Amino acid sequence: DGTTILANETKFKDGSLLSVYTDITDLKNQEIELLRLKNAIENVPVIVQYWDENDNLIMANNKANEMHREMGIKCEFVKGLFYEDMVRAQLSSPFFKVPDGETIETEIKRRKQYRKSVQSNYREVFLENDSTWYVIDKRLEDGSFLSIFSDITEIKNKEKEHKRLADAL
């Protein structure tokens, strides 16, 4: 009938036996749902990063590591990664530009201040390889922070081409 029972038996020195049966059907169903959610997050064509309230990485999907590998950024998205270390690695690469008049450390400070103050935000990020990313940042009720990054370079290039054609008319 789909019920999952956990059986636990303990034999005592006098030879008696204690048997405890626990219905863990709900736990098994939740486990299946969590695995399905994890699979969905791993297979969406966007980068998903989930950080705790102290800016330590809870999880990131494989797409995040793929992007860093493709760009030669020496930072792997592993549980516990500190946000500041990720930003420092990105800003040390040729793909992420430190704003004029700033240093890596002042840019890290600015980004940390942004993260502390933002509740929900949508923004575009332009990288030095001419790619454009649409970023959604959301502070959750428990203080954790969710960021979703979508590569919109093709869309932006088509918009430029349409504008160029429209201007030519």
Predicted segments, located by residue:
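Intrinsically disordered, low-complexity linker/propeptide segments enriched in Ser/Thr/Gly/Pro
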Residues: 1-8, 19, 135, 164-169
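Per-ARNT-Sim (PAS) sensory domains and their PAS-associated C-terminal
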Residues: 1-5, 109-133
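PAS-associated C-terminal cap
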Residues: 22-33, 150-164
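PAS-family sensory domains
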Residues: 1, 11-25, 46-116, 139-152
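PAS/LOV and related PAS-like sensory modules
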Residues: 32-62, 66, 161-169
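Short, ordered coil/turn segments that flank beta-strands lining enzyme active or ligand-binding pockets
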Residues: 13, 53, 62, 128, ...
